[in-house]
């Protein structure tokens, strides 16, 4: 909830409502991916969709994140996908598996070939499977400017339950940018406070 956030939402509004680069609901009935259906000229997505696009026979290219007004680039990387529940019956074994998977580059590469995700291990990202591929190269370049999602308790709920719903209301024209940011902050603060009590 800041001037920078307001600037982003105002630009987003301009793209949607003045420049008409996208219309809400346009992808309805297209399986949620108008790009894959050949109805949208570009998309903002991650490496996990590349295999689907190849299988669909799309002729596509990939570029890096757009730069902000100061020339900065930013991306978010995972960080909450691997967890061991407190009451797991095999917590030690799960931890050994996570270490095996994430600390040995060859294992990370093989998993990424299956999942379509980028490896968490930078040495794995330097493997020829990624480094010699023009498309994956764009995603490996993101390692130089990407941040890792916060491990603060409640963070993913702030994103999914506070921020995204408010952004959706904003782009639908139901609330103003200022209201969206204020509501997201208020709800997010509540979620974080509740998570801190657990």
Task: Spell out what each predicted region is.
Residues 1-25:
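Glycine-centered hinge/linker elements that transmit conformational signals in sensory
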Residues 1-7, 55, 66-75, 122-133, ...:
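Short, solvent-exposed loop/beta-turn-alpha elements that line the ligand-binding surface or hinge
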Residues 14-17, 145-198:
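Conserved C-terminal helix/tail region of periplasmic/extracytoplasmic solute-binding proteins
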Residues 23-37, 67:
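Short helix-initiation/N-cap motifs at beta->coil->alpha
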Residues 41-46, 61:
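Paired acidic/hydrophobic, glycine-rich loop segments that form the ligand-binding mouth/hinge
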Residues 63, 113-161, 169, 194:
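Long, aromatic- and glycine/proline-rich binding clefts that accommodate carbohydrate-like moieties
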Residues 77-90:
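A bilobed periplasmic-binding-protein/Venus flytrap-type ligand-binding module shared by bacterial periplasmic
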Residues 98-120:
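Periplasmic-binding protein-like
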């Amino acid at each position: 909830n800041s001037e920078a956030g307001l600037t982003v939402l105002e630009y987003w509004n301009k793209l949607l409502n003045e420049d008409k680069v996208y219309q809400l609901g346009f992808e309805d009935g297209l399986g949620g991916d108008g790009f894959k259906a050949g109805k949208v000229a570009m998309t903002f997505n991650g490496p996990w969709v590349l295999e689907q696009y190849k299988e669909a026979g799309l002729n596509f290219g990939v570029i890096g994140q757009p730069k902000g007004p100061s020339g900065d680039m930013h991306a978010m990387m995972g960080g909450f996908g691997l967890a061991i529940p407190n009451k797991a019956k095999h917590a030690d074994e799960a931890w050994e598996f996570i270490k095996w998977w994430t600390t040995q580059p060859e294992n990370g590469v093989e998993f990424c070939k299956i999942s379509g995700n980028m490896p968490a291990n930078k040495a794995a990202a330097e493997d020829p499977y990624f480094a010699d591929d023009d498309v994956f190269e764009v995603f490996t370049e993101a390692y130089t400017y990407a941040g890792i999602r916060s491990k603060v308790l409640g963070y993913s709920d702030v994103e999914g339950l506070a921020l995204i719903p408010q952004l959706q209301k904003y782009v639908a024209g139901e609330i103003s940018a200022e209201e969206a940011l204020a509501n997201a902050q208020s709800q997010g603060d509540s979620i974080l406070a509740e998570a801190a009590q657990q």
